[in-house]
Amino acid sequence: KVKDMVPGVNAPPMHPHCRSTTVPYVGNWRDKFFKDRQGKYSVEYDKVLQKLAKDEMTDAIDSGKIKVELNVEKQNRHQLGHQLYEDYKKKNIQKGLPIPSYTILDNSELNSLVLQKASKGHLTTDTNGNWDNKEIINFDKIIGKAYIDGKFIATRWGKVHYSKTGTHIVPRLKEDKQ
């Protein structure tokens, strides 16, 4: 502190005819400047990517490139008790892949949930920022069970896959933005 300074002891010696002053050392301002902004711009970039992906999605829906309605044939591969799910599960076990997640709601209820929640979740993008026709949505009710670490866990989250033939939902544990 300046008030505790004693010339020659903890401050440079003062000369009677010198016009010098002491200034506190504040460190390297560049380090603080960049440290304060670390991570700030990536959040803004993610928001820009989400907006661009949402615009791309609405354009694709309006032009008829993708349909929001549920594709029952694709959804049955994720419907517990259906023959397509059992075949899919058996194929994954033979290949050494994890057991697929499954939905517990019927297709009409899933369809109404998709129509209600479409474009309200997190749209996934590729490395270039282009929308990859998938969206992660919290459906606010248990839609199915995801297979994690050897057991099935009930979940409200689902990844919706959009295509020109319709959508299908794959239950997932949480919103990890993959």
Task: Report the location of each language-model feature.
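Activation/maturation switch segments at domain boundaries
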Residues: 1-67, 143-178
